[in-house]
Amino acid sequence: MTKKGKIKTAIIILFSAAVLFAAFSVTGKTLMKLAYPMKYTEYVEKYSGEYGVESELVYAVIKTESSFNPNAVSDADAVGLMQMTPETFEWIKTKLGEEDKDLSLYDPETSVKYGTFFLGYLLDEFENTDTVLAAYHAGRGRVNGWLEDEKISSDGKTLNEIPIPETAHYVKKVNKALNVYNNLY
């Protein structure tokens, strides 16, 4: 093969590799966006702005809690996109001064509004995202008890460990999703 032929072959190989790389990159990103969608954007953006919560955190919680299924129901009877229990829902209604009996956590806007309010409330109370997520999953009272235990919290504000494996796993899953949302969008 001549020098000119070798150069032409090398250029074709490099061009083909570049095209394959670009196609894989686009496909990989597209697949990640399918796995980590941004649904209910109008509600997430509205209420994350209103309650001072990073929208990516709201998406990460929804992804982890219900995988964007507004009809999801957990074993603990938490329902909707953000998986809230009826008791927590009623408590938040009093915090917001709302008495509407027709509100439903199966309604995406209601779920996002109340779940995002609760995340904002927990962020104000605990400040640390891992502690907030533990409280969202295990309950504020339980987490406040953990913070009083010197074996679990050395400063009374941050959890050194999360004593319930299911809650620790939940916090890791939300953080993974949060990392993906922060890097993907």
Where are these regions (language model features)?
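Catalytic glycan-binding domains that act on GlcNAc-containing polysaccharides
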Residues: 23-185
